[in-house]
């Protein structure tokens, strides 16, 4: 099979706010060949990645991503590995490349699975999949009372684990204490509580350390992203000062970055987004490495169920990796991207679809209201315009 076309679609809510919520817009990728289509989603700034895909080359290591994808043969997983390596080599110095290619790579797996009539998890080498315990991933409330109500609601819905993140957490010590206490009170003592602070402390070990007592008393399952992704010494120092495991890695945009975090940051959990790191294959490489280093692998997902499935597939065949991030505050755009949605089973867990490819289909009619039409001109000539859905 030949990769005949790669089409990018910029989707957006009518209004984009300053809320740290990646489900407000999306860049979908459609890859076509042999009369079949595969879909993927980039965790990316859509317009930036469109430019990255079609831009003129600047030099030998700054080609557009399209240069290494269009016209390639796609008949086996090894072809995806080969294309991935070529993209990295030919578009090495364009920093947006991993974000852009991630969605394309995901779509390649979907297309190949449909072509070979196999689910992606089997092409990754797994014989079977294991259910994951979802944690209801959401933002902290604007007040401790709102955090408490969110916690109660999640518990009532049936979640055994809940993560609160971002908001204003990490700025005021006294307010942080109130939010943590509210979350724990709302969840009760048996529900797992995770906390994501979105790198709010940059690389300030003292600021992070001042919250350890409250986190330990609340029996927090993990503290996520206390620092920037590359703040290795701060991560390591904090890990040696607390019983609370640290989680991080969503900012990793290649497997080596994630492996370095595993080796040098003292992490208990490595959290990877297939839409950032280079796709499903790159995420699977990290999951395999996490097994060898006795570190828990977890997906990062705060967008659509297309992205959700893509980020669980790399570790769905590992029984000991038990958690998965399950976003519960999606904007309508993110929900409307797919026809199917992955729901909790009778045991309150998540199962991977068994169908060919990714096992989940894009709702073409459902996304049309969110489509942003893009036209790029260069030297007075049309260089790019949004393709037809």
Where are these regions (language model features)?
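Metal- or metallocofactor-binding catalytic centers and their adjacent structured scaffolds
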Residues: 31-32, 36-115
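Conserved, mostly hydrophobic/aromatic
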Residues: 3, 35, 104, 117, ...
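Structured beta-strand/loop patches that form or line metal/cofactor-binding pockets in enzymes
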Residues: 1-39, 43-48, 329-337, 386-389
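Shared catalytic-loop signature of beta/alpha-barrel
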Residues: 92, 213, 219, 230-247, ...
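Glycine-rich, aromatic-flanked loop segments that form ligand/cofactor-binding clefts
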Residues: 99-101, 105-141
């Amino acid at each position: 099979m030949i990769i005949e076309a790669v089409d990018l679609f910029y989707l957006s809510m009518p209004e984009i706010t300053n809320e740290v919520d990646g489900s407000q817009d999306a860049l979908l990728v459609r890859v076509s060949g042999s009369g079949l289509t595969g879909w993927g989603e980039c965790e990316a700034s859509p317009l930036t990645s469109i430019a990255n895909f079609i831009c003129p080359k600047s030099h030998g290591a700054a080609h557009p991503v399209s240069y290494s994808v269009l016209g390639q043969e796609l008949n086996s997983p090894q072809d995806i590995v080969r294309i991935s390596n070529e993209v990295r080599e030919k578009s090495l110095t364009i920093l947006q490349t991993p974000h852009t290619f991630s969605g394309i790579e995901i779509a390649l797996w979907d297309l190949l699975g449909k072509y070979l009539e196999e689910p992606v998890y089997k092409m990754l080498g797994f014989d079977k999949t294991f259910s994951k315990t979802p944690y209801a991933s959401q933002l902290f409330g604007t007040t401790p009372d709102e955090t408490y109500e969110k916690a109660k609601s999640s518990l009532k819905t049936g979640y055994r684990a809940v993560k609160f993140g971002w908001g204003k957490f990490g700025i005021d010590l006294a307010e942080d204490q109130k939010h943590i206490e509210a979350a724990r009170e709302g969840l009760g003592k048996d529900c797992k509580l995770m906390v994501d602070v979105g790198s709010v402390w940059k690389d300030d070990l003292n600021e992070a350390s001042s919250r350890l007592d409250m986190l330990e008393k609340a029996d927090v399952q993990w503290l996520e992203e206390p620092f920037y992704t590359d703040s290795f010494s701060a991560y390591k120092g904090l890990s040696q000062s607390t019983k609370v495991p640290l989680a991080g890695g969503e900012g990793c945009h290649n497997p080596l970055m994630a492996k370095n975090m595993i080796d040098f940051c003292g992490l208990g959990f490595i959290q990877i987004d297939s839409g950032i790191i280079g796709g499903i294959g790159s995420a699977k490489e990290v999951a395999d490495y996490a097994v060898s280093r006795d570190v828990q692998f977890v997906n990062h997902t705060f967008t659509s169920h297309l992205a959700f499935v893509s980020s669980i597939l790399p570790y769905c065949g590992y029984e000991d990796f038990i958690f998965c991030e399950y976003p519960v505050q999606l904007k309508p755009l993110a929900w409307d991207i797919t026809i199917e949605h992955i729901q909790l089973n009778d045991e309150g867990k998540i199962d991977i679809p068994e169908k060919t490819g990714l096992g989940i289909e894009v709702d073409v009619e459902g996304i049309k209201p969110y489509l942003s039409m893009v036209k790029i001109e260069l030297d007075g000539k049309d260089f790019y315009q949004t393709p037809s859905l």
